[in-house]
UniProtKB/Swiss-Prot annotation:
Forms part of the ribosomal stalk which helps the ribosome interact with GTP-bound translation factors. Keywords: Methylation, Ribonucleoprotein, Ribosomal protein, RNA-binding, rRNA-binding. This is Large ribosomal subunit protein uL11. One or more lysine residues are methylated. Part of the ribosomal stalk of the 50S ribosomal subunit. Interacts with L10 and the large rRNA to form the base of the stalk. L10 forms an elongated spine to which L12 dimers bind in a sequential fashion forming a multimeric L10(L12)X complex. It comes from Vibrio vulnificus (strain YJ016). HAMAP family: Ribosomal_uL11. NCBIfam families: L11_bact. Transmembrane segments: none annotated.
Amino acid sequence: MAKKVEAYIKLQVAAGMANPSPPVGPALGQRGVNIMEFCKAFNAKTESMEKGLPVPVVITVYSDRSFTFVTKTPPAAVLLKKAAGIKSGSGRPNTEKVGTVTDAQIQEIAEAKAADMTGADIEAMKRSIAGTARSMGLVVEG
């Protein structure tokens, strides 16, 4: 018989840096999940990623307190900030531009996020990411 799903927990955890402190500890602790077991498994799975990059993770907790988790790709905004070499987006995106990204960089981000995005094709994903870039105050070249 299949295990009964008790909860889904969605978190954003820095790649390779999961530890029992908030937000991981309290979210898993209240469900009775072994926090250190999750931290070790998550850090092992994300060791190939750039350390510190926020990674969305969906944890499925079962009635016997076991768990499974699925990692997603980092948010588009984080990847865009990294590509443009900026710390944060613009407070006034339509008037104050803070950086530029090229069409090639947007293509690269769209390909990286293709597994998580539900866009029909790569062009639709590129348009979505370009829109995110513009809303952050980035100039899209190309």
